[in-house]
Design a protein with these regions (language model features):
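Catalytic cores of histone-lysine modification enzymes
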Residues: 31-115
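Residue-level "contact hotspot" at macromolecular interaction interfaces
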Residues: 9, 46, 52, 129-132
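Short, surface-exposed beta-strand-loop junctions and turns on beta-sheet-rich folds
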Residues: 23, 67-68, 145
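Intrinsically disordered, low-complexity regulatory regions of eukaryotic proteins
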Residues: 1-39
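C-terminal SET catalytic tail plus cysteine-rich post-SET Zn-binding segment of SAM-dependent SET-domain
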Residues: 110-147
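A generic structural signal for residues embedded in beta-strands
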Residues: 8, 61, 137-140
């Protein structure tokens, strides 16, 4: 497998030269989050803060690295009409983040209680509160979760 180069800039403005095989387009040095084993029993992987993240910061974009589908494509892929990593911002538009090799957004688990992040209308995952280093990022996907 050929790993892409991180698309971030260094502090002096030069392109980063590190490779990133997972969670493109940035390497682990240039992301605010990391994927690790979730604290939620049976959830598998989860998304965690690598450092403290302030309220209102964008931590991922559900439209980057996801598969965009129309309703027909969604039903073909998910015949039951139910999916766990799909966000639907509008009727007939779906973004599938099931492939964690291309989308870090899909690693954020659903909050069963209080969420500390949300997905805005533009698909950006934004912190609702300040999140301390090491804390799992949880999102209330609302009615678009498990469609």
């Amino acid at each position: 497998m050929v790993c892409p180069i991180c698309n971030a800039k260094t502090k002096v403005g030069n392109p980063c030269k590190k490779h990133t095989c997972k969670f493109a387009p940035k390497c682990s040095s240039h992301t605010k989050v990391a994927v690790k084993k979730s604290n939620i029993p049976g959830a598998g992987k989860g998304l965690f803060a690598r450092n403290d993240i302030a309220r209102g910061e964008t931590i991922a974009n559900y439209k980057v690295g996801t598969q965009k589908m129309n309703h027909g494509q969604f039903i073909k892929k998910y015949p039951t009409g139910r999916a766990t990593h799909v966000w639907s911002p509008a009727k007939g538009i779906y973004f599938d983040a099931l492939n964690l090799n291309t989308s870090i957004a899909g690693a954020a688990n659903r909050a069963s209680g209080n969420s500390n992040a949300r997905i805005n209308g533009g698909g950006k995952m934004v912190t609702k509160t300040g999140i301390k280093k090491g804390v799992e990022i949880l999102v209330n996907y609302g009615s678009s979760y498990r469609l």
